[in-house]
Amino acid sequence: MFLIMATALTLRPVSAATETIVILVSDNEADCALANYIANLTGDVNIVVVKTHWGVYDPNITAEIISYAPDEVIIIGGPVAVPEEYVEDLQNLGISVERWWGQNRYETDLAVIKNATVRFQLQLQNRVILVAGTDLAGIEKALQLAIRERAMIVLVNQTTNITKIMERLRLRAGNFTIMGTPFTNQTMLRIREQLREHLKECNCTEIHVNMTAERALEAIQVAEKALTTAKELAENTTNPAVENILTIAEKQLEDAKDAYNSGKYGLAYGLAIAAKSKAEVVTRLAGEDIRKMIMRNTKMKLERELVRVEAQIRVMERLGVNVTVALQLMEQIKAAIRNGDYDTAQELMIKLREELRTCYLAGRGIIKGKAHMPVRRREQP
């Protein structure tokens, strides 16, 4: 499954002597916060954060990554959030890829904290920021505080076991900050009770994030974006569950807007988050259907491959890499597909992938010389 969409980038300052690492992450608020957390706490590495829509493959994202000629790509999030097509694209070009993830955003959070601490030798304080994993406003404030205090961010929900998390992260009893909004009161109350029950020495601070019109509107806009993507993908699926879930999500979003217009910002915020969650379910279900459909149709699969490789060819061509042979192979593949000669097209596609790898590795120095360079220090989120 893929759409052609714009790339959002977050840049850190760079020095000529450092390596460049791209962090590829979905626009899921939890995973995205982790990417920005790493980008702000690392020192001698140039970190480029590239965002893709949750659950959607976009060949232009691969092209954007190529334009940085990275030494390594780290993916935050599982293959549902950041599709495996990205891994295939990058590894085919000889780019090292590592995925940090878990079965859900809570497991991904723990995996990222552990891996980043080792990989970048992060010097973190004995302080933990606890925030609900679906709380947009809470996560935003938690990120700001975690960066400022060099604290760990731990995402929680109703089933979180704080004791087990501390064991996994090898945390000593220390300073805990519970970050909450009215939307997450019950979850954070349960977390607070766990801390008081299981930790005899616990310095616990609570921060309540007020629900403002601005925060409610931001949640509505995020939900609208997720729903738009879900609708586009749903047009290509016959899964009966998709339509029902979409209907519920649309109703929740409309109710969120009504609540917002009535000044009920907490209610609007909660409904918007619920609508976004359902939109992501639709994106996942539709994506699964579309992938199955493509795998069963040789022509469709080849055309999809062409879109992927053409984006890579064009960005290398723009950056001054010699892609003459690759362009010739691409035109031969198009002709073979038009003639219905799919066997020949598949054979040529293998050659084209090999040629692209050769082009990238040979032209990497050229690309690196023209790589995007940030012009100022990125502001704290």
Where are these regions (language model features)?
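Membrane-interacting alpha-helical segments
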Residues: A223-T238, K299-M316, K370
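Extracellular glycan-binding segments that recognize GlcNAc-based cell-wall polysaccharides
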Residues: V14-N236, P240-D255, A259-K292, R296
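Amphipathic alpha-helix face/heptad-repeat signature
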Residues: A219, I245, L271, T298, ...
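Regular secondary-structure segments
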Residues: L246, E250-N261, L327-R338, Q346
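Intrinsically disordered, low-complexity segments enriched in Gly and acidic/Ser/Thr residues
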Residues: K292-E331, A335
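C-terminal amphipathic alpha-helix
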Residues: Y265-T298, L329-P381
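Charged, low-complexity interaction regions
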Residues: A234-V242, Y260-A268, V315-T324, R338-Q346
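Sec-dependent N-terminal signal peptides of Gram-positive bacterial secreted proteins and lipoproteins
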Residues: M1-P13
